[in-house]
Swiss-Prot record:
SUPFAM superfamilies: Translational machinery components
Name of this protein: Large ribosomal subunit protein uL18
Molecular-function GO term, any one: structural constituent of ribosome
Assembly mode: Part of the 50S ribosomal subunit; part of the 5S rRNA/L5/L18/L25 subcomplex. Contacts the 5S and 23S rRNAs.
Organism: Paramagnetospirillum magneticum (strain ATCC 700264 / AMB-1)
């Protein structure tokens, strides 16, 4: 019997394999979602470095958000990561949702990052 954790890992593995096939070495926008916060990183897999990162725990956002676990917080993080990525000279990325379903907070973050100037 598959446990929820095993199902999540299976979805995550499928998503990452798809990104590796279609990404062609492009920069990856990776999302991690916890119960209380949301985190996002812009990662260069070829060199193994993180180029930009943002989360609901950043000082710029933490005081302005009522909680880090809602769509508004995810949208704020999406806008912040778009600003930081553009400052680092990155405009085109591949969206890595991990094992998370593209809905709710993950979708809100992605839409805000697109509005901020990232293309994926």
């Amino acid at each position: 019997m598959m446990t929820p954790k095993n199902l999540f890992e299976r979805r995550k593995r499928r998503a990452r394999q798809s990104i590796k096939k279609k990404g062609n070495g492009r920069i990856r926008l990776s999302v991690f979602r916890s119960g209380k916060n949301i985190y996002v990183q812009v990662i260069d897999d070829l060199n193994g470095v993180t180029l930009a990162a943002a989360s609901t725990l950043d000082k710029e956002l933490k005081g302005n958000l009522k909680t880090g676990a809602d769509k508004e917080a995810a949208a704020a993080v999406g806008k912040l990561i778009a600003e930081r990525a553009k400052a680092a000279g990155i405009t085109e990325v591949v969206f890595d949702r991990g094992g998370y379903i593209y809905h709710g907070r993950v979708k809100a973050l992605a839409d805000a990052a697109r509005e901020g100037g990232l293309s994926f």
